[in-house]
Swiss-Prot record:
The chain crosses the membrane at residues 66-86, 126-146, 176-196, 221-241, 255-275, 290-310. It comes from Dickeya dadantii (strain 3937) (Erwinia chrysanthemi (strain 3937)). This is Uncharacterized protein Dda3937_02003. Its main location: membrane. It comes from the Bacteria. The lineage of its organism: Bacteria, Pseudomonadati, Pseudomonadota, Gammaproteobacteria, Enterobacterales.
Length: 328
């Protein structure tokens, strides 16, 4: 009978390096747990979870698509307005046509563009009315989609509740009034921003303070504050009036301020990035389209994330009432 060789006994001695690794891992885990337990950071984590669970990225992409699609009838109305202006100023129309002809070396292409301009001027009424009707329809649907996306982030549960159902004509009427309100809010925002920018140099010149160096950053800070205040009014309307719900006042005001500051940062980033895009041939051709789509997408994501942040201000309410996606 063969004798089995002696098997070496497994060593029970622990590797010092593995013990140190576990200690470091435990330290990092505890450190991350302490960071996550900070109320402000925990709030952002809850908002991010709700934003992702309730398809914030997908809703943002849908809002971007509908926003870009709504630009087509707006361009039709713009061309019709230009047609009315050119029709009332024959000299301006003649000068525009001559510039087109002189700037294009290909005679057939110049002739085609000349006929296009003349056709646009002749059909300005038809194009304007058609574009206005399409813009009204697409604008009402756009505001409705934005409202539903904000509702998805703001509801206590994911599914639409029976009491939220409303008649279709009432929904379209409310969306139409909401669209008018949004346009008024945009006009006020643009007015305050433009006044803040133009009045800055006028006030400095009127007071004879051109030579004071430290006044320039102060005036820039004042103009920035006015612009953020205008953004605040716009997002207060979007996050409070548009979805027709009553969140707690504190989270609403703080979330609106966060959206206003983020929107101002987005505008600054776009003013820096768009000139850089225009330097390349492809950027010159598609830069404006890419810039608009990027702006709409980040605007939608910012709006929906702030809506989720406002809705998750109370951790107890969020944990007890948040429901999973249907079929999850």
């Amino acid at each position: 009978m063969p004798v089995k060789p002696n098997q070496p006994r497994p060593s029970t001695k622990q590797d010092p390096s593995s013990g140190a690794s576990r200690q470091r891992f435990g330290y990092v885990t505890g450190w991350l747990h302490r960071i996550r337990s900070v109320p402000a950071i925990a709030h952002f984590i809850r908002a991010g979870d709700r934003f992702n669970d309730r398809m914030g990225n997908q809703f943002g992409a849908a809002i971007t698509y509908f926003s870009f699609l709504s630009l087509i009838p707006i361009l039709m109305v713009s061309f019709a307005t230009a047609g009315f202006v050119l029709a009332s100023n024959p000299d301006l129309l003649t000068g525009l046509i001559n510039r087109i002809v002189n700037s294009i070396s290909d005679p057939s292409l110049a002739r085609t563009l000349k006929n296009t301009v003349n056709t646009a001027v002749r059909q300005r009424t038809t194009v304007g009315l058609t574009g206005l009707l399409i813009a009204l329809y697409s604008g009402v649907n756009w505001i409705g989609n934005l409202r539903e996306a904000i509702h998805a982030q703001s509801r206590d549960v994911w599914e639409r509740q029976p009491h939220e159902e409303e008649k279709i004509y009432l929904r379209y009427l409310w969306d139409f009034l909401s669209l008018i309100g949004l346009l008024l809010a945009l006009v006020i925002t643009l007015f305050l921003t433009s006044v803040a920018g133009s009045a800055q140099a006028t006030i400095v010149r009127a007071l004879g303070l051109n030579g004071i160096d430290w006044l320039r950053p102060v005036m820039t800070l004042i103009a920035l504050s006015i612009s953020i205040f205008a953004n605040y009014l716009l997002f207060l309307w979007i996050l409070w009036v548009l979805p027709r719900h009553n969140p707690r006042r504190g989270p609403l005001l703080r979330g609106t301020l966060m959206a206003a500051i983020g929107f101002e940062a987005l505008k600054f980033a776009m003013t820096v990035a768009l000139p850089e895009l225009a330097t390349s041939p492809s950027g010159a051709a598609f830069g404006s389209v890419i810039g608009l789509m990027t702006f709409f997408y980040f605007f939608a994501r910012l709006t929906l994330f702030c809506a989720a942040w406002i809705a998750t201000a109370d951790p107890k309410t969020d944990i007890n009432t948040q429901a999973p996606l249907p079929g999850a």
